[in-house]
Every structure is written in structure tokens, then in C-alpha cells.
Design a protein with these regions (language model features):
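C-terminal juxtamembrane segment of a hydrophobic transmembrane alpha-helix
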Residues: 24-26, 33-51
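Residues in soluble alpha-helical coiled-coils and helical-bundle/repeat scaffolds
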Residues: 31, 35, 72-75
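Membrane-proximal N-terminal amphipathic helix
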Residues: 45-87
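Periplasmic/extracellular, small/polar-rich flexible segments of pilin-like filament-forming proteins
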Residues: 72-187
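Short, flexible active-site loop motifs that bind/organize anionic cofactors or intermediates
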Residues: 16, 43, 127
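N-terminal leader/signal peptides at the extreme start of proteins
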Residues: 1-19
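Residue-level recognition of specific faces of alpha-helices
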Residues: 20-26, 59
């Protein structure tokens, strides 16, 4: 009879040990879950950064189109300014902050007329995006923006006419953590 009690007790003890997880198993599960969550957050951060870069390039295209449309009958871009474009209501409201323009990374956008060696005074216009993160700066300078682009550059180097930039040129040009990227569009 005692042996039956001992074996019944042993079975009960084994079953109670098999239920649930040990503290080490719980810690291991939590560590794995933390790694997965961290990975998802990193991927989301990258995706949102890519999205902002795409939006900034779309904003640049909208600005270029708005300026060219407003000045299509003019012989030059004389009188062009950021406030002229803001007041024209030719851009999305999400870009306008008072009398200024903001790009997807929340930096200021400046639009000014400029001169080129082959076009003369006020024959082109500059669009500058301030405070562009380094990785976005590199991506933006390596994009082919079409025939109307005269030259481009970032805050640490002079503008260059050989466009689009190679990755090495963009990396060298966008060496600061936050850069001012300027594009010059000709006629």
C-alpha cells in the first residue's frame, strides 16, 4: 500500500513539475520577443524614412512645376521668391507654414531666382531644402530629375552639373548629419 502511495505521489509530483514554464524559459521567451519587437521597430523606422524621402522628392517636383507654370510667359525668373510661390496657392497646404514652405523632414524650403553662365541673369531658379538628413540627402542627389535640372549640390560642396550624382559623389556632398540640398533648374 505504501508503494502505491509513493508511486501516486511521484506521478503527481511529475505532473506538477511539467506544468508551466521555469523562470529561465520565461526569460528566454521575453528575450526572443524583445529582439523581434526591436527588429520590427528598426524596419518601421527605415520604411518611414524612405517614405519621407519619396514625399520630399514629390514636393520638389510640385515646386518645379508650380514655378515653371507661373513663369511660363516670362523671359526670366526675376521677382521669384518663396513667398510668391506660397501666395500663388499652387502647392499643397501641407507644405505651407505661414509665409514659408516646409519639406517632409520639416526643414525650410527656399526658392530664389539665379543666374547661369549660359542663360544670363535670372535665367534659372534655385530650390533649397534645409535640414535634410544625411541618408535622405544622398538618395535625393542620386535621383535623375530630368532635363530641366541644371545643377545640384549639398551644403558641404559646390554644386555640380554632372547629374545625377554617383553614390560616391552624393556621399561626399552629404557628409554632414543634416544638409542643405540645392537644385538649380534652368529653362
Amino acid at each position: 500500500m505504501i508503494s502505491k502511495l509513493n508511486s501516486a505521489y511521484a506521478r503527481k509530483l511529475r505532473r506538477s513539475r511539467e506544468r508551466g514554464a521555469t523562470m529561465m524559459e520565461v526569460i528566454a521567451y521575453l528575450a526572443i520577443a524583445a529582439v523581434i519587437v526591436a527588429g520590427v521597430l528598426v524596419l518601421l523606422s527605415i520604411a518611414f524614412g524612405q517614405s519621407k524621402t519619396t514625399i520630399a522628392l514629390q514636393q520638389l517636383n510640385q515646386i518645379q512645376t508650380a514655378v515653371r507654370t507661373l513663369y511660363s510667359g516670362q523671359s526670366s525668373y526675376q521677382g521669384l521668391s518663396t513667398s510668391v510661390i506660397v501666395n500663388s496657392k499652387a502647392l499643397q497646404q501641407s507644405m505651407i507654414s505661414g509665409n514659408t514652405l516646409r519639406h517632409a523632414f520639416n526643414g525650410a524650403i527656399t526658392i530664389t531666382p539665379t543666374s547661369t553662365t549660359d542663360g544670363g541673369a535670372n535665367s534659372a531658379f534655385d530650390v533649397s531644402f534645409a535640414n535634410v538628413p544625411q541618408d535622405a540627402c544622398q538618395q535625393m542627389l542620386t535621383k535623375d530629375l530630368g532635363r530641366g535640372l541644371y545643377e545640384a549640390g549639398a551644403s558641404t560642396t559646390a554644386q555640380q552639373p554632372n547629374l545625377p550624382f554617383t553614390l560616391a559623389q552624393a556621399t561626399a556632398s552629404c557628409s554632414a548629419t543634416y544638409n542643405t540640398v540645392t537644385w538649380t533648374f534652368g529653362s
